[in-house]
Every structure is written in C-alpha cells, then in structure tokens.
Amino acid sequence: SLPRPPMICAGCPYRLFGQIVGKMRSKGKLEAVFGDIGCNTLLHFLNAMDTALAMGASEAKRLGYVLSRPEAASKCLAVLGDGTECHSGMDATRNTIFRNVPGVKVILNNNWTAMTGGQPSPTSPANLAGDPNVFDLNASLKAHGAHVVEVSGYDKKALEKALKKALADAEAGTFTTLVVTGVCIRKMPKDSYGVKMAVDPELCVRCGMCQICPGIEADAEELPFFNNICTGCVSQKQACAQMCPKGAIAPARDQSACGLTSCPDLPVPPETIDLPAVTRGLPPFLSVAIRGVGGQGNLFFGRVLTQLAYLLGYDKQNIVKGETHGM
C-alpha cells in the first residue's frame, strides 16, 4: 500500500471544489460523481469522485445514469477538465442538451493540460505556435445552448452557493454547466508564489478543519504549521483560511520572515560522475515499459531513462527511440 495517496498540488484551484463535493457526499446529498482523466482524477482521494474512464467520458456516463434513473438528476455530477471537455466532452454536452436531460456538469477550467506536463489546450492563452488564442470555452458552450455558470475555484462560499443552486435547478428539470475557474499553479507567474501564512494561536481551536492541503500540517501542539511546499494559493483567496471556522488563519503580517524552523542538509553533488566505459555487449535495442504512474510520471521517468541510455553509450552506436503513453 502507498504511504499516502496521490494528491493534487498545494494551492491547486480544484481543492476547495473537492472538499465541498466530498462533504456533500458524506451527508448523502450526492450519490455519484462521474469523472474522466486528468488532474481531476485525483479528486477521488478527497472522496469527491467515483469513476474515471476516458477523456471527456464523464458527462456521457452521467447522461446514461440519469436516463436510467431520472430521480437521480439532482444527486449526481459529471466532472472533467477544460482540455477533456474540448477533446470529446463537448459531444456529450451537446447530446445532453439535444435530449433535454437535467443535471449538473462541472468543468474545472485551469487553462492547461496540466496532468501530462502543462501542454496548451484550446483554453490556453496561446496555441502551440505561440499565436494568441481566440477560442472562448464559455461562448462555445452557450452556442450549444448550455446554461453556463462561472465561479472561481478559490471562492468557497461562491462554489457552495453555485453547486447548491445548480442541483436545485436539476431537480426542477434544468441542465447546468458549472465552469470552475483557476489557472494551474504551475503556470502562474513566480511573483504570485511565496505568500506566507500565519495562525493566531489564541483563536485556533485545533479542530483540524484547515488541514486539507499538503502545504499545511499540525505541529507538536496541534497548531497548523505551513511547510515549505505551501504556495499561499498563488496569491488567490487561501483555501485553508476559508476552511477555518474561527478566522485564525491569514497571510502573515511580516512577509519577510521565514516560517520554517530549520532547513534540510543536502549533500553537495559531485561536479562529474565517473562511469565505466561500455563499448561491448550492448543489446541491439533497449525497450522499457513504464505503467501505472500517470502522465506526469511517464514523462519524468521517460526522460530519466533516456538520459541513462545516453550515458551507457546508446547515443553513439544505437538508435534511441522513446515513446511515452501517458494516462
């Protein structure tokens, strides 16, 4: 078993949505959440997703579920990303509108294909050639006839209100496309990082409600402690502060102070690495399969193995061909 399940990034705009949906599921307000493939798949580990099948498949699954159980229209969600909506999810959106099936579809729009390394998607600021993007996701959805509601992924109260309203409308027979916005933190400018958070020990009741993110943990006294992977929610409305019922968490008054008590001692890497010369005995080709690590893992390990192949001499006397099959 894993020491901990995979997690979305510290400060990810998907996190509050996952927390809200997980809470609704635990209270019995949602009986099924249909997902597809992408960073949103990790919402499963926040108790906020039941299925993950293929790019853009979530709404088609929800549609079939509601057609077979019409009474469940207000008790289920379809969730997918902006990239997979553009990939094939819009077909299901169109089919839902065509068949006049009520319900709620949630598009988590972070403007990038984040799970596989941050490639441009049709919602990115520019295309692969660097040309400015003119595609408008919301306008496209509205052109299909969808009722579109946009809300920030960093606004907990607005998210809760929008979800509650959309589910109530579903019970009344309306199909709502809820677009949750928030740029992938890996694409945010560097100066948006580094907001230091602080907790008021006089107000904190040590309830643990704020500990929803890998950037925050409890110290020896059960007070929230912000570790070195806290991003400050990239200068957006901080999720942990919104989770706190006592208002004990806020950006630190002194942003120049370091919140870490110590820094790890890292060994100094050598300037060069002596490798044994390999000139004989190399097989005619090298084939390595990597499975079960997700898109980003495939990309990372593919690069590592390619570098190792070069170091072993394959760059000089053998052809190196790499194929990465993500997700």
Each language-model region and where it sits:
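Thiamine diphosphate
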Residues: 42-179, 189-190
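Anionic-ligand anchoring segments at beta-strand to alpha-helix junctions in alpha/beta enzyme folds, i.e.
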Residues: 20, 24-59, 289-327
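Phosphate/pyrophosphate-binding active-site segments
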Residues: 1-22, 148-155, 160, 177-181
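A short, basic/flexible loop-to-alpha-helix module at the beginning of a structural domain
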Residues: 269-285
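Iron-sulfur cluster-binding cysteine motifs and their immediate structural context
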Residues: 205-229, 235-273
